[in-house]
């Protein structure tokens, strides 16, 4: 069950309208690593968690907060658009310089959403459920969460550098702080799970069923041997085994030869040599 609180978690009020920045801000709302993605990712991970209540609660707490961030950013986008009426934009566009700036406005904001946010990226790509990861393996999922928070915080930091609007910067500063917390919480949870299960996912798959002679080889597939200079090659792998550097990749299989397709699929016939 969800209960909506009408107050925002943090203020989301720009100092002035900026349709172009509203378009840019769509990325951290409906882009691949935007707030919609992390909210839905954590929700489905939480709903699918079995028998690990403390992690389920962590996921649901974080997911619910992220829904609030969706609301904050959507509000900010709407406010960046609301005081810039279309007739004023048309008049301003008569100036070539201003016109070139307004020309970058997301037309969806005017045509589709009526000066409101959209569930899409800064380039108008609709948000997709294919962005989220919810595998049922918490260690794998928490690593995906760490990546999502890392990419998301990176994008927020870049947006922070693109504006001098104090109101926008204030909200972005808050989001940066919360992403710092979320990165740290996933790092801590990953460390805890690795201590229980080992660092390789899935830790439940029998090692005897994998070709272990290849399990810790760093294979050189390119010219030169710069990759051999990794300091960690001289240390134990995170799972306790020894690394091995292979300076030249070898082939262990045969040249693949496929049978001709059946006539009913109408493939190109094999060529004659």
Curated annotation (Swiss-Prot):
Task: Give EC number(s), comma-separated.
Answer: 1.11.1.6
Q: How is the cofactor bound?
A: Binds 1 Ca(2+) ion per subunit.
Recorded hits in InterPro entries, A to Z, give:
Ferritin-like (IPR012347), Ferritin-like_SF (IPR009078), Mn_catalase (IPR007760), Mn_catalase_C (IPR027407), Mn_catalase_dom (IPR039377)
Instruction: Relate the activity to temperature as described in the entry.
Output: Optimum temperature is 55 degrees Celsius. Exhibits a half-life of 2 hours at 80 degrees Celsius.
Q: Recorded GO terms, molecular function?
A: metal ion binding; peroxidase activity
Q: Where does Mn(2+) 1 bind?
A: 35, 66, 69
Q: Where does Ca(2+) bind?
A: 57, 61, 220, 222, 224
Give the top-rank taxon of the lineage listed in the UniProt record for this protein. Answer: Bacteria
Keyword annotations? Calcium, Manganese, Metal-binding, Oxidoreductase, Peroxidase
Report the pH sensitivity of activity: Optimum pH is 8.0.
Among SUPFAM superfamilies, the record links this protein to: Ferritin-like
Q: Does the keyword Manganese apply?
A: yes
Reactions listed under catalytic activity: 2 H2O2 = O2 + 2 H2O
Region annotation (Disordered) ranges: 254-273
Q: Which Pfam families match?
A: Mn_catalase
| Top EC group | oxidoreductase
Q: Which cofactor does it need?
A: Ca(2+); Mn(2+)
**What do we know about how this protein assembles, alone or with others?**
Homohexamer.
Please report which protein family the annotation says this sequence is part of. Answer: Belongs to the manganese catalase family.
Q: What is this protein called?
A: Manganese catalase
